[in-house]
A protein has these predicted regions:
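Extended hydrophobic-aromatic, low-complexity segments
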Residues: 77-78, 102-104, 116-118, 145-149, ...
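A short beta-sheet element
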Residues: 31-32, 48-110, 119-124, 129-133
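Extended, folded domain segments that form the structural surfaces/walls around functional sites
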Residues: 18, 80, 151
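Short amphipathic alpha-helical signal-transduction/dimerization elements
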Residues: 110-113, 117, 157
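Non-catalytic DNA-recognition/assembly elements of restriction-modification systems
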Residues: 1-13, 24, 29, 135, ...
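Juxtamembrane/interface motifs at transmembrane-helix termini
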Residues: 20-21, 38, 63, 124-127, ...
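Sequence-specific dsDNA recognition surfaces
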Residues: 3-20, 33-62, 86
Length: 188
């Protein structure tokens, strides 16, 4: 079962009534809408250290695998590119025994997403829980096979990460240049 090999936790949402939890925040805070079978390099919102201390949000390690437990992106996965926090709708996996790599876990969870959605429950909307996820059986291949899988996957992961970072730079450049082009301040 997944729970034998991975600890799970979720985060929290700092109270919006405390402006100091968000103002000038530098700690990325993941929401399920940002989990899209991707690598999360940056988030829409950041929180402060006070926001972490004053809520159930936790600092999560770089490289952690995160799953959306409910909402539009239920069952979708992401890697955290740096130390981040998340809200309570996210399930974060942390390795207990280093038998199963994060790449293997990510792809295994991806491969059983339909099953997870089938067993997900909820009155108004479908949702998953940490308890349900921890009880799901996981196929564990021999260690050597997992190592070979990781050797194949890691360069692809690094390439995807580099392309995402390059894409972010291009988006920033576009957003900077487009208003200048539209206003006539910059000519082609």
């Amino acid at each position: 079962k997944i729970g034998l090999h991975y600890n799970t936790c979720s985060g929290g949402t700092p109270s919006r009534t405390h402006e100091e939890y968000y103002a000038d925040g530098t700690i990325p805070w993941v929401k399920t809408g940002e989990i899209k079978d991707n690598i999360i390099i940056h988030t829409d919102e950041c929180i402060t250290e006070d926001g972490v201390k004053g809520s159930s949000a936790k600092l999560l390690p770089q490289g952690a695998v995160v799953m959306a437990m409910y909402g539009v992106n239920i069952g979708m996965l992401a890697y955290l590119d740096s130390e981040m926090t998340c809200n309570q709708a996210c399930c974060v996996f942390s390795d207990k025994n280093e038998i199963i790599s994060r790449h293997y876990l990510f792809h295994y969870l991806y491969s059983i997403r339909d099953y997870l959605l089938l067993i997900g429950f909820g009155a108004a909307q479908q949702n998953l829980s940490q308890d349900l996820i921890k009880k799901v059986k996981i196929v564990i291949p021999p260690t050597e096979l997992i190592k070979k899988f990781d050797e194949q996957k890691e360069p692809l992961y690094q390439t995807i990460r580099a392309l995402m970072m390059q894409n972010d730079k291009l988006i920033k450049q576009r957003d900077m240049l487009l208003p200048r082009l539209m206003s006539g301040k910059l000519e082609v």
